[in-house]
Regions:
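Membrane-embedded alpha-helical bundles of multi-pass enzymes
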Residues: 1-204, 398, 411, 428-434, ...
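Active-site catalytic loop in hydrolytic enzyme cores
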Residues: 68-75, 120-150, 312-381
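Conserved hydrophobic/aromatic beta-strand scaffold that supports enzyme active sites
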Residues: 18-21, 92, 215, 321-323, ...
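A general structural motif
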Residues: 219-220, 251-256, 345-351, 369-375, ...
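Short, solvent-exposed cationic patches
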Residues: 348-365, 392, 453-474
Length: 488
């Protein structure tokens, strides 16, 4: 391969791969992007091609991830370097192992390697599953159903396998007599996946219990820019304490009043986003009494995203959800266990890692908070517990609002759980157990309340039972395949 062809393939591949991580990603981008990158790395010596590939991918990822990773610049570029290394690793394995044999069965090495390194990154890196290319397939409901069986790993495998087969066919000059078997094999597997996914959606429950729920978001006009951040950090001194307490009182009153409005409109469950109700530690008992009174008088379940501030502590913020039933009882209180790296991690007390699930009149209700849901194995606690409804308080920012919303759909499918997503600075929404959107509202549109009639009831999924077994099988397959090819 000439240098011009190499650079063209590399740049096209890097562009398509890069936009796979954006909320508005074109779904076919990773399928073709990985194929172009494979073609580039296969057509030039590893010592020349792989370092250039790593550099170009680093630039692409640094550009598209801007605004997504909430860390200062020095750490941002270090994290991008780590993400780039994980992205390049499967190409290294493919170039060094798969090229030892010209048979089409070697097309499996690249997808096995991609799943292996993606799996390791999800389990070990602080960002969880954020770098998964499977999320680019949001909206393709039949394909998304594969997550109920394999988690997102099955979707990732198919994307990478398509790229590997396409590149192999490219190398064979697309001679049909040569590429027929792998092409038909892939088409057959994909057809089965899509048909099975379609059947799963068609057979989805259309009748059954549902609940009218409302997500009440942060009100505008109370705090000055940066003031909420300062309160969450516990930076309150005697000179402005009275002013801060008055604003917090207005905030509390706003949430309670709007909760009453939604309950009188028919809502049986009202949820508030992550840390939207900031409250000083000493004022929390009094506020909770007011919240219990509202829940009892309106006969509702109230799930509150609280940010309890301990002024003077090294880590002043308790980021938690407290749920009160219509009898005024606190049925669970859960603290977030996965703080977002950077600012939140520096100020937040970390929870114990046990997700709550309680029996209610609505069924078994569970919860997690925002970034917790980006760790599939962690959230599987709710799937194993046969949770009928998950309440997920979230606090996003503009750059990630749709991307993070889309990721929630995969958690619903994996665990067979309907999800109420109450978001501030993002998209509130509700999903059924098959990942279908029941309702959504963009906080940036100026709408502070989302209302949805959410189907309730868990659906048993294979993934909730076996977890990441498919990913582990890919790890084993990569090791076994590499040994066989090296010995051969």
């Amino acid at each position: 391969m000439g240098q011009i062809t190499f650079l063209i393939s590399l740049l096209i591949g890097a562009f398509l791969f890069g936009i796979s991580f954006r909320a508005n990603a074109i779904s076919f981008a990773p399928w073709l992007g990985l194929a172009f990158l494979l073609h580039a790395t296969r057509g030039i010596s590893p010592s020349r091609g792989l370092p250039v590939t790593a550099f170009v991918l680093y630039i692409a990822l640094a550009f598209v991830q801007r605004g997504i990773l909430p860390v200062p610049d020095p750490l941002y570029f270090i994290m991008i370097a780590g993400i780039t290394l994980v992205a390049v690793a499967p190409f290294v394995v493919d170039r060094l192992i798969a090229t030892r044999n010209s048979g089409w069965i070697t097309t499996l090495i690249f997808p096995l390697a991609w799943v292996t390194f993606d799996f390791a990154q999800t389990r070990l890196a602080p960002g969880g599953s954020w770098e998964s290319i499977a999320y680019s397939q949001y909206g393709n409901l039949p394909l998304m159903q594969l997550a109920a069986f394999t988690g997102t790993w099955g979707i990732t495998f198919l994307i990478a396998w398509f790229a590997s087969i396409l590149n192999w066919g490219w190398e064979q000059k697309f001679l049909w007599s040569t590429i027929r078997v792998p092409a038909l094999t892939f088409v057959g597997v994909c057809s089965l996946v899509l048909i099975a996914g379609g059947i799963r959606i068609v057979r989805a429950h259309k009748d059954g219990q549902s609940v009218r729920a409302a997500a009440v978001s942060f009100p505008a006009g109370i705090f000055q820019p940066g003031e909420r951040t300062r309160i969450a950090e516990g930076r309150i001194d005697a000179t402005d304490r009275a002013v801060i307490e008055e604003k917090l009182s207005r905030l509390h009153q706003s949430f309670l009043e709007r909760t009453r409005v939604e309950s009188r409109g028919g809502a049986k469950l009202v949820a508030w986003p992550e840390t939207n109700l900031l409250v000083l530690q000493e004022d929390e008992p009094s506020f909770l009494e007011h919240a219990r009174k509202v829940a009892v008088e309106e006969r509702i379940y109230l799930a509150m995203g609280l940010g309890t501030v301990h002024v003077g502590n090294a880590k002043p913020l308790e980021n938690k959800i407290v749920m009160i039933d219509p009898a005024g009882q606190t049925i669970f209180s859960y603290e977030k266990s996965h703080p977002v790296p950077g600012w939140e991690e520096s100020i937040m007390v970390t929870g114990d890692g046990r997700l709550p699930v309680v029996a209610t009149d609505l069924g078994r209700v569970g919860s997690a908070i925002c970034f917790d849901a980006d760790f599939p194995e962690y959230l599987r606690q709710l799937g194993r517990a046969r949770t009928d409804l998950m309440v997920l308080p979230v606090n996003d920012w503009a750059a990630i609002k749709y991307q993070h919303f889309a990721m929630t759909a995969f958690r619903a499918i994996e665990n067979g759980i309907p999800i109420l997503r109450a978001a501030s600075s993002g998209v509130s929404g509700a999903f059924d157990a098959w990942g279908r959107v029941v309702a959504l509202t963009d906080h940036f549109s100026g709408t502070e309340v989302m209302v949805a009639e959410i189907p309730i009831g868990s659906v048993t999924t294979l993934y909730s039972v076996i977890g990441d077994l498919f990913a582990w099988l890919c790890v084993a397959g990569l090791i076994a395949g590499s040994v066989v090819l090296m010995l051969a």
